[in-house]
């Protein structure tokens, strides 16, 4: 097969989620709805945290950052997927592909980091409550998040620069619905040894280190809970981190359950399903998990709704009673 330099390649071709044309309208409507729900849910979390001074603490700072990352994460892949569902060619330009690789790796890395920082925040809140304000200093938290953003941007830039040196054949089809780095490397005509080493080393570090940090944090949390004599104290302590634990299980469970299954060779369909779980499903459910299990977030959302939405007085009265009820329960 004739090889062409990457500078001559103008586009790649992506796969559909389904080969059945009759399913395309249904899938388009489904993923468009999921995308809009994700955008709205995460935007509400950001607005609720930023508009309520009671939520200006490290835990909700990390939560608002996670919501921002989830908005960017799903916006990296789903809009192009929706466009291709309405297109006959299913193509993506070379520049668009590089852009997807860059931002996808950045945001998935930040998801890992933020979940780890939130686990550590829970650990400090439960195991060292008297030192919480000292350890989880707002300035330190801000610098930590900023530092990891810079690190992820640099790592993704290296991925893209290495990928930019590869050769591809004209009409190359990527076996995925978006440009995932591992799948792009598989279809290159060049030697991808260096690319693969860098990718697997970084993937291992970004997988093992955050997961180890989360497991260590929760092992200490469980140990502290077992030493508590009061049932009420145990419930309050667990409710502090219950939402985060659900999100961690959803994010890592979808990856571990599919990518690290007993199958030696993963089919293209399994890879796409795995990607949908943590690129679409997880960002969509995160706001619901945090708002349904967290009284502070529910109160903040209620107050935001009263200020923004022009509602009849009887609806505002119901929301106000709900807010007061949750405030009394938190006392």
Swiss-Prot record:
Membrane topology per record: Multi-pass membrane protein
Pfam families on file: 7tm_4
Transmembrane segments: 26-46, 58-78, 107-127, 143-163, 197-217, 245-265, 271-291
Sample GO molecular function, one term: G protein-coupled receptor activity
Extracellular topological segments: 1-25, 79-106, 164-196, 266-270
Keyword set, alphabetical order: Cell membrane, Disulfide bond, G-protein coupled receptor, Glycoprotein, Membrane, Olfaction, Receptor, Sensory transduction, Transducer, Transmembrane, Transmembrane helix
Classification via InterPro entries: GPCR_Rhodpsn (IPR000276), GPCR_Rhodpsn_7TM (IPR017452), Olfact_rcpt (IPR000725)
Disulfide bond positions: 97-179
Subcellular location field: Cell membrane
Organism domain of life: Eukaryota
CDD domains recorded: 7tmA_OR7-like (cd15234)
Family, similarity comment: Belongs to the G-protein coupled receptor 1 family.
Name of the molecule in the record: Olfactory receptor 1174
Organism in which the protein naturally occurs: Rattus norvegicus
